[in-house]
Amino acid sequence: MTMSSFLINSNYIEPKFPPFEEYAQHSGSGGADGGPGGGPGYQQPPAPPTQHLPLQQPQLPHAGGGREPTASYYAPRTAREPAYPAAALYPAHGAADTAYPYGYRGGASPGRPPQPEQPPAQAKGPAHGLHASHVLQPQLPPPLQPRAVPPAAPRRCEAAPATPGVPAGGSAPACPLLLADKSPLGLKGKEPVVYPWMKKIHVSAVNPSYNGGEPKRSRTAYTRQQVLELEKEFHFNRYLTRRRRIEIAHTLCLSERQVKIWFQNRRMKWKKDHKLPNTKMRSSNSASASAGPPGKAQTQSPHLHPHPHPSTSTPVPSSI
């Protein structure tokens, strides 16, 4: 028992790596090959495991050669360390777990419990951990960066005029974000400003004393239908009663004043078209002609009847 325990300690085999059956094989071969005090027995520790390789072949289907199981059991850990950075840099790829055999990934075989893998930062040290974090830094969620930029930009623009280096009335560059808020899109809800010079003035000449108040009454523009109905009414009657004027104004959507003014203008046009004299001028001419000059009337009066008609009989006084 002392010899078998010494052989186990000399080979540096951890109890969890080889199966339980190998301990009995090592203990039996150790007593036969090495003596209790012989030196050659201590210098050949790999010999006993190589003799029992045929027994271990059925338990390792993934091993390629006869010496690969010994390498997986007795090789130092540094030979398997290059697999950790690849697994840490590409954690999303699942093909890495199926492509590598059990002996290469973690030294585990189907006949023994799997060994828990250590994180790359603990296996490689602080230098390799920083390298892995530096490579994984671009994989952080990038959409969060552009979302954080818009809130920070207005704060900078608002704080720019308050800096003591730039004067209040100086020519500091305007912030484009503040100018965008004052764009015409933001003034949609407000009514447009109408200045006095933008108003239309219906006067023939420019009035220098005009102060921008209410402009002169504009000319009424009648539609073709309204003019047609008014012409029909004027054809039958050139003068309207108040009742008829109210009916026409209500029918044509006009005011009574507009209908009255239209008929007045239409009567003046009708008189001009028919060349009728003005009634006021004709009455004045008739009055002047009937009066006549006084001298001309006296001279013409004796010539009206200069001599009596012979046929007329005049009474003759008998006393003469």
Swiss-Prot record:
It is found in: Nucleus. Residues 215-274 bind DNA. Its main location: nucleus. GO terms for molecular function: DNA-binding transcription factor activity, RNA polymerase II-specific; RNA polymerase II cis-regulatory region sequence-specific DNA binding; sequence-specific double-stranded DNA binding. Residues 139-153 have a biased composition (Pro residues). Disulfide bonds: none annotated. A motif (Antp-type hexapeptide) lies at residues 194-199. It comes from the Eukaryota. One of its GO terms (biological process) is anatomical structure morphogenesis. Residues 28-41 have a biased composition (Gly residues). This is Homeobox protein Hox-A4. It comes from Homo sapiens. The lineage of its organism: Eukaryota, Metazoa, Chordata, Craniata, Vertebrata. The gene is HOXA4.
